[in-house]
């Protein structure tokens, strides 16, 4: 089904967004669009993020799904690159984002480059998914090979795969040092073949305490600064800001 919802930008102007081919079942964000509650979610609050950026800032949306984050950020005047690894979702994302000059990339991110077959394709939960081919890339390499511009902000929402994907973002984390909006899926393990989900540090997963060691400050979904140890015991939405980008009053 299709659905139009209204987004109000930080200046108060209202924009009608059209989403196409929404799923009516499964574990996905579509139901929030259908119920018109998308912009009540903590991961879809944009005012604080926009205030951290300048107009025309470059934003990467990793795990773009169908464009629900990319579109509002583009409306706010940012330049978006949307990365979606699952073919069905990528097709829908391109369709939804076509009016907004968003650049779409069909790739998933991991700690190694490989092509796998997986049923984790369109976030359906009925067990009837067809197997799809997923193209995993090492993100630092993908940026270099495709001559992508360095981002000012990176949003990551990849259902636990952040524990592997960030191993392939060393240059991005340590040298480019963007602001991060992290969908942190703590202990979100997967049993789906071809999609490992969360990997513990002891098993080779990325140690998120590295952000603290590298001088990033951690903020929760309410914009409150929190101790980095919070990442050792709960998930949620977090913003990682390099200390040099904190605006001092």
Each predicted region: which residue ranges?
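Short, glycine/acidic-enriched loop or turn micro-motifs at the edges of active sites
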Residues: 64-66, 87, 111, 158-160, ...
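Short internal loop-to-helix segment that lines adenine-nucleotide cofactor pockets
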Residues: 34-62, 104, 115-176, 188-199
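Core alpha/beta nucleotide-donor-binding catalytic domains of modification enzymes
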Residues: 87-125
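S-adenosyl-L-methionine
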Residues: 1-101, 128-129, 144-148, 207, ...
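A short, compositionally biased
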Residues: 1-4, 112-114, 212-214
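Active-site donor-binding loop signature of nucleotide-sugar glycosyltransferases
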Residues: 19-21, 107-109, 120, 136, ...
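Conserved acidic-Pro-Pro-aromatic motif
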Residues: 76, 142-249
């Amino acid at each position: 089904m299709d659905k139009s919802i209204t987004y109000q930008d930080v200046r108060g102007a209202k924009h009608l967004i059209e989403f196409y081919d929404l799923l009516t079942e499964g574990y996905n964000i579509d139901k929030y669009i259908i119920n018109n509650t998308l912009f009540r979610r903590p991961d879809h609050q944009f005012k604080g993020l926009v205030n951290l950026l300048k107009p025309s800032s470059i934003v990467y949306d990793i795990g773009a799904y169908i464009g629900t984050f990319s579109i509002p950020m583009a409306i706010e005047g940012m330049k978006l690159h949307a990365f979606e690894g699952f073919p069905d979702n990528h097709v829908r994302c391109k369709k939804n984002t076509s009016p907004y000059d968003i650049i779409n990339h069909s790739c998933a991110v991991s700690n190694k480059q490989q092509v796998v077959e997986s049923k984790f394709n369109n976030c359906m939960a009925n067990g009837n998914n067809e197997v799809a081919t997923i193209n995993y890339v090492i993100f630092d390499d993908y940026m270099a090979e495709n001559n992508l511009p360095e981002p000012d902000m990176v949003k990551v929402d990849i259902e636990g795969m952040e524990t592997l994907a960030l191993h392939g973002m060393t240059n991005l984390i340590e040298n480019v040092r963007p602001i991060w909006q992290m969908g942190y899926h703590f202990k979100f393990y997967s049993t789906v073949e071809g999609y490992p989900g969360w990997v513990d540090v002891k098993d080779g997963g990325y140690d998120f305490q590295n952000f603290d060691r590298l001088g990033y400050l951690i903020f929760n979904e309410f914009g409150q600064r929190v101790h980095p140890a919070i990442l050792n015991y709960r998930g949620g939405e977090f913003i990682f800001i390099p200390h040099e980008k904190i605006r001092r009053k």
